[in-house]
UniProtKB/Swiss-Prot annotation:
Keywords: ATP-binding, Cell inner membrane, Cell membrane, Kinase, Membrane, Nucleotide-binding, Transferase, Transmembrane, Transmembrane helix, Ubiquinone biosynthesis. The active site is at 289 (proton acceptor). It comes from Xanthomonas axonopodis pv. citri (strain 306). This is Probable protein kinase UbiB. Is probably a protein kinase regulator of UbiI activity which is involved in aerobic coenzyme Q (ubiquinone) biosynthesis. It holds the Pfam family ABC1.
Amino acid sequence: MKAILRASRIGRVILRYRLDALLEGTPAERWLRLAKPFVPRASAEIAAQSRGARLRLALQELGPIFVKFGQILSTRRDLIPADVAEELTLLQDRVKPFDGQAARLIVEAALGLPVSVAFASFDTVPLASASIAQVHAATLPPDANGVRREVVVKVLRPEIERQIDADIALLHSLATLVERTHPRADKIRPREVVAEIEGTLAAELDLQREGANASVLRRFWEGSDDLYVPEVIWSHTAERALTLERVYGIPSDDIAKLDAAGIDRKALAAKGVRVFYTQVFRDNFFHADAHAGNIWVDSDPERRLNPRFIALDFGIMGQLSQEDQYYLAENFMAIFHKDYRRMAELHVEAGWMPSNVRIDELEAAARSVCEPYFNRPLSEISLAQVLIKLFRVAQRYELTLQPQLILLQKTLLNIEGVGRQLDPRLDIWAVARPVLERILRERYSPRRVLRELSKRLPEIMTHAPDMPRLVYSWLTQQVEGRHQIAIRSPELLALDLSLRKLQTRVVTAITGSGLLVVAAVLYGLHPDGWYLGTVPVWSWISGGAGSAALLVAWLRR
């Protein structure tokens, strides 16, 4: 019943913000059309706004979980129009804080200790509050030297898992409905989007996992002058409570404060770009939620001329496969050299495009995207925008991208935005190119090859004795003509599934029609038995069942 009420509320919000066009061609649109006369419409001021703005306002009204849904959806620029994605990036994950005493109880349950024992002090007034968790200031008990260390404690909201499970279940139902009925479902891939959102939210609900992310990132950047990562206090961390060293800094978008502190913004902007490319191509572990609120600048006066970033919030991290890492770096270098042929070849070699695509057509498409950028000033060129437009154009040729690559696009866009805000004349290409060239040199260096070989040596030694037997067996099969090839085609499986669904619909429709005929025959025969009005009860039952079957067949179109 709760799910029905929740779905009803979502429908009312969709109608009020005039978003029913988003569901065009689906059964949901037909039901909404019936409800439209009974739902008050939005004001003329809201109606005049763009579809992206209306969607953003609707998500904000539906609550924090849908705000998070919108934020994640904004990263899927391969699935939604650019104007909608841009508007969804404005969603703010700020909600009313929950009671500080409730936070104390959650921390005590998570750590298995009273707060008064675990901490010397715990401020019940939160420093910040979001849809998943909120953050409290605290101090640890005195150490051996009598020092009370300042920390922050991130605490999950009470019953947040139950709320998310209910909303995700509803989103899964809506996604299944859209996939079955929407004419562009193969392009939107709604179930894939909801599954990605579910995975992202599940990761953010495990604060111990977030602590592990922070710990790994800190290890990569230990002692760096470019990036600082707060230390995780593992003795005070659990699944529902995360304790980190407290850090002080200036948000990277607060230009007035940065200037007042005498920070060298030009040096800082270049460092931001280098840090990102190093995370992606050296460490293969990048901060994937790098907006200005999560990227601070160290406020230490001694670091004015050699500024350092501080990373916060480690719930969403990204990693690429070795192949994607290499092909992405090669793609960037091909862009630098205006080698459109190589860009087209790399898209196919990486497996992002089907092997039967015409390289010359893809080359022409890449040229049409990149050439307009090369005629702009260097300070206006965006690698993120080039990459996004390349992938969008490539969708015409059945582009297949892993979610991590899409996450990287969004992160690169954020990093470039932060860099350009700090230094509007930042030449991102000049900063990124040396990093990429070094990465590619190292990839082919003899030292790296030997290192990779030494890692695989135990595996090679394990399988080496079996190789002669396997080769002999394969050659014997070739000579005797016994070699068989097993073909597994996702397209054939999808076709089989579509045919099964069609068969089910046809059978349901035939059954429904038959029951209606039975109802009419019974009515004409006037059989003995019970009547409801002038119609036999069995006619009512048969007619009702037939109508229900036809309705089900219609909804499954």
